[in-house]
């Protein structure tokens, strides 16, 4: 994993704020897309890379009969998520410390797995996909949401966007993120047996 080095650059509080904003900005469109893919209330859901719990909280609020497990490799973010969502009963919400590569979660446990902006940090995306496949119940669904810097689609970026991209590129290089993972996801999924 290459995630923690972002703290050296922007600090934990700024990273939590960034993740909170990221979760809220795309929520309405993402939630519609997740429902279109088959997400339904009452499902058992795994949120891989649950971070500070921002997205997990949105899932809990919009799926009141679902049981959600947040899996997070970063102890700082996991602690923030647990504190933030401590009022939810354990029948609805569980958090697990660990990587998707060795989660310790029971195979065939989840109806729906959501993996948002995690693959760009993975050194072994094929192994992660293999583990996700094992964790899904038969007929289960995985939704991988990630980025690809080649798909931004801004025809004439303004000066602020250009300067922001320079800063983001610095973070990407230092953290060794794979910001072109989006174009590889379909091949990875097919290779690991997803239809």
Describe the residue ranges of each PLM region.
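Class I SAM-dependent methyltransferase SAM/SAH-binding core
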Residues: 46, 52-102
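A short acidic, Gly/Pro-enriched loop at the edge of an enzyme's catalytic core
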Residues: 101-112
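A short glycine-rich, Lys/Arg-flanked "PGG" loop and its adjoining helix->strand segment in the class I
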Residues: 126-141
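Conserved catalytic/acceptor-binding region of the Class I
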Residues: 143-195
